Design a protein with these regions (language model features):
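N-terminal secretory signal peptides that target proteins for export/translocation
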Residues: 1-7
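Bacterial N-terminal signal peptides
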Residues: 12-24
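Beta-strand-rich domain onsets/edges
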Residues: 27-46, 50, 68, 75, ...
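Short, ordered, surface-exposed loop/turn motifs in non-cytosolic proteins
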Residues: 54-66
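Glycine-centered loop-to-beta-strand initiation motif
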Residues: 77-86
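Short Pro-Gly-centered beta-turn/loop motif in secreted/extracellular proteins
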Residues: 86-92
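Short, aromatic- and glycine-rich surface loops/edge beta-strands on solvent-exposed regions
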Residues: 92-103
């Protein structure tokens, strides 16, 4: 009787973790573990892509959207995984999506408050 209960619990736990994995894996988290960071420096936005072990994507495209998800422009990254662009149309915030191909994407959101605070912080320095 105890063996049946143990087996049933094991099967239930296995199924639970299998379903969690199926939901989590396609999310792109496993896809090269691409990370993107964006911040404001004065009147420019700096973007940096990162891969595991300190590596950088050598090629890719950033897509910059406003807070309403309207594409503002796109730009190629530099071979060191960075890009920058003038800070414009930021009143509704910005979403910076980095696409390095083969479905490997990640994004960073700069809210209007983030942008305002980072600009003010830079002016104090």
């Amino acid at each position: 009787m105890a063996l049946k209960l143990y087996t049933g619990c094991f099967i239930a736990l296995f199924c639970f973790f299998f379903v969690v994995f199926l939901v989590w894996a396609p999310s792109g988290v496993l896809a090269h573990q691409l990370s993107v960071f964006a911040w404001v420096e004065g009147d420019n936005v700096k973007v940096q892509g990162k891969l595991p072990k300190g590596k950088h994507p050598k090629q890719g495209t950033i897509f910059v959207y406003d807070g309403n998800d309207k594409l503002l422009f796109q730009k190629q990254i530099h071979p060191d995984g960075t890009a920058s662009f003038p800070l414009q149309n930021w009143e509704t915030g910005l979403k910076i999506l980095l696409d390095i191909g083969d479905g490997h994407q990640s994004y960073w959101i700069l809210t209007p408050l983030d942008i305002k605070q980072q600009r003010e912080e830079k002016m104090k320095q």
